[in-house]
UniProtKB/Swiss-Prot annotation:
Record gene name: pqqL
Active site: 82 (proton acceptor)
Phylogenetic classification of the source organism: Bacteria, Pseudomonadati, Pseudomonadota, Gammaproteobacteria, Pasteurellales
Cofactors demanded by this protein: Zn(2+)
Family per record: Belongs to the peptidase M16 family.
Stored InterPro entries: Metalloenz_LuxS/M16, Pept_M16_N, Pept_M16_Zn_BS, Peptidase_M16, Peptidase_M16_C
GO terms (BP aspect): proteolysis
This protein's name: Probable zinc protease PqqL
Annotated source species: Haemophilus influenzae (strain ATCC 51907 / DSM 11121 / KW20 / Rd)
Binding note for cofactor: Binds 1 zinc ion per subunit.
Highest taxon listed in the record's lineage: Bacteria
GO molecular function: metal ion binding; metalloendopeptidase activity
Ribosomal protein found in the keyword field: no
Amino acid sequence: MKKTTALFLLIFSLIACQSLELSPNNNLPFDPNIQHGKLSNGLQYFVLKNTEPKERVYIRLVINAGSMHEDDDQKGIAHLVEHMAFNGSKKYPENQIINALEKLGMKFARDINAFTDFENTVYTLNLDSNNQQKLELAFDVINEWMNNITFLPKDVDGERGVVQEEWRRRLSPMLRIGNKKSAIEMAGSRYVLRDPIGDMDIIKTISAKRVADFYHKWYRPDNMSVIIVGDIDTKQVVKLLKQNLSQENPITKTTLEKIDFNIPLINKWRLDSISEQGTTIPSIELSFFENTIETNTLASYKQELIQQITTRLLNLRLQQWEKETENGVDSANFYRTHLGKETLQSIFSLQLIDTQYSKTIDKLFAFIASIKQQGFTQNELSGEIKRLTQLNEKQLNIRSGSLKIADDLITSVANKQVVLSVNDRYELNKRFLSQITLADLQRTLNQTLALKAKLLLITQPLPQKALPFDVAEIETRWNNVMEMQQHQWDEKKQIEKLPHLTFNTGSLSQEKYWDRGDIYEFRLSNGSKLIYHYSDKTPNQVHFRAVTQGGLRSIPNKDYHLLRAAVSVVDETGVGELSLSAVNQIFSRDPLVIATVIDDDKQGFTGVSKPKDLENLLTLFRLKLRSSPISDLALEKYRRETRDYFKQIDLETQFMQAVSKLRFPNIETVYTQKQAQQLSFDKNQLNNAYQHYILDKTDFTYFIIGDIELNQVKKLAERYLASIESKTQIRHFVPTIIHTPTQSFIMNGLKEPRADVEIYLTADNTWRTEQKYLFNILADIVQEKLRLILREKVSGIYSVNSWFMQDVYAPQIEGKIEFSCDPKRVEELTYLTNQVLDDIIKNGIDENLLRKKLAEQHTQIRREFDSLVSIASIIEESYWQQDNPDAIYTYQHLDQLATKATIDALAQKALKKSGRFVSILKAASY
């Protein structure tokens, strides 16, 4: 029920320059690069050319109608209308809208989707090409959504079950605890009566006419906006808009009904406590409520910037405060968020180590009082102004992708907020950052603390106990602490510094240059290999990896859990002799992390930095290799979290433990850990395990990939990587052999009225490079055929997921099909699933479906190459598989590899009956 304030999110974001008037009451200037206007029928449009990524176009249709716009007998109908938009229109009956878009390479749920919240319904189309045909089809579909959705009784009846399964799937303790919080925070408002998922009794019985009534009342062009961002000709797009979306609607001659979005402010202290099965971590939330203010003026922009600085400094102090063990606090933070459309909530949120609420409340009140009385220091403000000034300079030249811009615009458009240009935002930040004073921060904090509407909300583990205080006592304690003189805040004068490292500089020589991928291979003087690739897909970012063979399946089974625990505790302690808090202090402006990674078959270290900080990251890497101390604090935290984990094991976890035991007998997995063993590990055991298995194996292959020049990489590699002693160990990888039980496994007792069905698929197979893509295509085919039967035909599920995979060293294909449903329909839907799999084996893959999925796979692959994270992963994976970049280009032969005969043969193997294992978790009463 919350969404972060759009203006807060937009500060320093990217979305080009005009003069700014200095009067604080002047309105913010709208980005001149965005073509925006209104068609004759009232439809607003926002069109922006952005060439990152090339050829892509992102379209968003925003309807200013959500669950808050429903009548009492329509609860859930805004969401049902959203579903019906994909079930038929005058031009595209039944599912033909999806079919038409998918023929152009778009994929349902990935490129074609929608969502409904309290205030809006949003439809999304992601086009992988900007050609005229796709744009015209997209506008044709949008016109159908705007004007011509049909509500045939049979179609509405078919979708009722789908919505019920969506409702069923989301049921959980976390949902219930969230609903309990919202009922308290939003008390007295329409919001608590209008959950977007709706009332299932209404969904089951409402007439098709009443569903259509909502559509005809609220889906009117003067209540909509369309957003188009991408590699486009804006004039052409606006012309297409006018040609395709200008249909008049007589209802626009009537006045739109006003909706009450108000959450009444309860201008006094409130105290409440909630609990829920499965919630085991106690917490305290202290909230202050106020009405929203005007956000489109220069004054409001400056105030939001002041608020951002205040929030940041509060959180920096909270980070220091939470480390004081007598506070009983595991984590603490402060943030501001929208509560509904017209209310702001400022929250101090604390997760506790124990249930000594009274003591922690007093400590929190004293913390707040000390800042209220003494304020922040000039050092704190100057440091933050310096950080934001540097960030402002960097953001001026950073490109933002079209997808992010389009999605950010949804919030701005829905809330009628001004969108600033890059240059205007830069100039405003530059001006206002030089003006902000300590008095501004103090005024802002005092205004929040003086708000009368306060709520202290405590979340207790079960069994819930009566609180040893009432609201009157809490108010008295607050007032007393605010008046009591507090201790001066200790700024912690000790300044941490990176240790000075001295070691011999090594050398490197270039062994290969792969022109096709612009990939360099170097041999370091210690024998290790370095792979370098320049990419600015994420500007100002570099990925570093040091990887070697090994992993959890190369060590004795008895040490599996010991090593996992050792990695966790060592990383939580810090980096070598530097504590985690010291690392955070040194790199507070530009955070750096070097983390241990360990998989089944490989291990090493990973980190991400800005180009200018790569030397610091490599320094941390060298420190990490030097020693692996374990602090008392990190060990105690590990033990506390272990106890909490075993305390809160729910039926879902027990189910996964049982399934894992059946499929991996006599093999240690993440589900076989035992509390006594996990808590028995001491410092020496953990340190020795990390030293032996991690630090004594340093025959790495290094990867440096990102926005950094070759010469800089070579210098850093010679200094920091080439002189590392290459330690080797002889280890033998032991692949896990998956067992397929002959009988289905059923566990009863789920507290939700739901069944979770998982069908595992296993087959012996020799790994081949190209199978990654073939697995994806087969999984998509299986998933679509199941969706058409289980969802579209029999309305038994909301969604189904399927996947197949095989690791390089694994002797088997592993796959999974999963869905949730009404417990009464488990047998029926499982039978239908097996029917679909049997039919694929018997009759093979439909060639039209294969062509469609092949086109979708090509689209997905192109998108992967737009992401630096994906590029780094693809390069590393290729070298891991065959010690060269050849596997990167397998996709170029996909049309020849993914033939009907090949996919049919793969399906025959992967879907065979003898490799299927059905596991079901369902409600106790079924």
